[in-house]
């Protein structure tokens, strides 16, 4: 089984600079308010949420499986951008593909769906955010995840959004931060108001610290290098040296 998980399958928000942070801010000063990004018009319906990877792998006899990351598309929960939730969600899918977890046709239904067609041997693949998720899944040590191919993955959100105690912006996205990425991927309109209140404002904007840019518990939770003790999947990783968005040091 070739498995790709993504926060992008159901659509994305605006990349207009008017919804990013104002970078003209002095160190140790409170940032100015950021304009709210318009809601995302969710696209995609079950059972087909993406055709990614199908042409590359299905002709060779592989089954391709897709899932939307937590808080995106038809997935439940809130987008947490880099926490253990994004590792445990694909782990649950792999557990289902191996018959260790139950799946149902609806979140609150009782009609079970079994992956009778799965051998239980899973490989994950993806680029950028879609490449970070396989790495995160592999840190759980889940049985059945045999190999991953992450292309330009981001394994540390601190190094993506901060640099040696300073706030930085990924290449090409001046003023972006972890809460901006949250808005960009939050394509589940059913949970937007709730998640904005209990997670974006109460956790992300309260703790990501645009005043100093220092490393703290918020960023430590989003550093995959802190969770590699159980990593067991064979890995083929690719990265460009001149990538100024997700840099090789991340």
Residue ranges and their predicted role:
Residues 2-7, 66, 96:
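Structural cue for short, hydrophobic secondary-structure segments
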Residues 231, 237-239:
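Short beta-strand/loop motif that positions the catalytic acidic residue
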Residues 7-43, 47-55, 59, 87, ...:
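Accessory cap/linker subdomain of secreted extracellular hydrolases
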Residues 54, 58-74:
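Conserved alpha/beta-hydrolase
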Residues 244-249:
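Conserved alpha/beta-hydrolase "acid-adjacent" motif
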Residues 155, 242-243:
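Short, glycine-/Ser/Thr-/acidic-enriched flexible segments
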Residues 44-47, 73-92, 101:
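Catalytic nucleophile-loop/oxyanion-hole region of alpha/beta-hydrolase
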